[in-house]
């Protein structure tokens, strides 16, 4: 499985635009491959863009996904993982995914999205603490990183 990451701690560098264009182009060129986009940004700009952007109500669609049960975002996924962080979940990650093409006809059908969420700001400290706990017989860092991988 190939992984591509866009990251820069500085805002305004073009991460969202570059990621959006790369994802869509790759999806068009490789229609038989499934692409999972994980938006790990509390601002969720990439999610909004994939869901329709400014002109097609991407922000409102994202709010709907955040209001779903379960909350169909990475924050919703983490919210259910936090109470039992070191054990396998009783739910499936599929419950949190969104198919952007259902909301934005310009997005290829082979793209799935785990939407960004403002809750990540609040969850970051808890997740960091859990990853750094010292529990005999448990590699807590791997257990937490495994939530995504």
Where do the protein language model's features map onto the residues?
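P-loop NTP-binding core
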Residues: 1-149
């Amino acid at each position: 499985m190939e992984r591509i990451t866009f990251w820069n701690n500085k805002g305004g560098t073009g991460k969202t635009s570059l990621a959006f264009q790369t994802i869509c182009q790759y999806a068009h060129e490789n229609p038989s491959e499934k692409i999972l986009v994980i938006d790990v940004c509390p601002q969720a700009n990439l999610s909004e863009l994939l869901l329709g952007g400014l002109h097609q109500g991407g922000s409102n669609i994202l709010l709907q996904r955040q209001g779903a049960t379960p909350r169909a975002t990475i924050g919703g996924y983490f919210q259910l993982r936090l109470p039992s962080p070191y054990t396998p979940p009783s739910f499936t990650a599929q419950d949190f995914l969104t198919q952007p093409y259902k909301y934005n006809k310009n997005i290829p059908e082979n793209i799935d999205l785990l939407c960004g969420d403002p809750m990540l700001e609040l969850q970051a400290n808890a997740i960091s603490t859990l990853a750094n706990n010292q529990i005999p017989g448990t590699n807590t860092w791997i257990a937490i990183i495994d939530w995504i991988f």
